[in-house]
């Protein structure tokens, strides 16, 4: 399976979906891992650590969403990321469903 790890784009989110150690484990199990360029920088991981673990560094999140079978994130996808998801692509992330509802939606009883 081809696993993609984009850089988190939600403000003040510095984590990344996979650490280099996790990448090493997944690659050892036969998976291909794509990590967005400098995706782990804010979490304290550089591109070199990911490549040494077996990941391929790709330029943009769009490249990851276009090529990966599964997307691994920390935070709920932002609209631009939802728009990049493909049919039958798996998204592995935390979801914050309360953020999906507005007061208008909560009042809708239909």
Regions found by a protein language model. Name each.
Residues 37-56:
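N-terminal beta-loop-helix "entrance" segment that forms/cooperates
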Residues 64-77:
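Rossmann-like NAD(P)-binding element
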Residues 101-110:
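Single conserved hydrophobic/aromatic residue that forms the stacking wall/gate
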């Amino acid at each position: 399976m081809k696993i993609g790890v984009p850089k988190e784009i939600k403000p003040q989110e510095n984590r990344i979906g996979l650490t280099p150690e996790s990448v090493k484990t997944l690659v050892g199990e036969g998976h291909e891992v794509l990590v967005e360029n400098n995706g782990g920088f804010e979490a304290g991981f550089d591109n070199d650590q990911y490549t040494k673990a077996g990941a391929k560094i790709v330029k943009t999140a769009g490249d990851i969403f276009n090529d990966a079978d599964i997307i691994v994130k920390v935070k709920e996808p932002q609209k631009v990321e939802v728009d990049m998801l493909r049919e039958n692509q798996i998204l592995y992330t935390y979801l914050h469903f309360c953020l999906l509802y507005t007061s208008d939606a909560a009042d809708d009883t239909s």
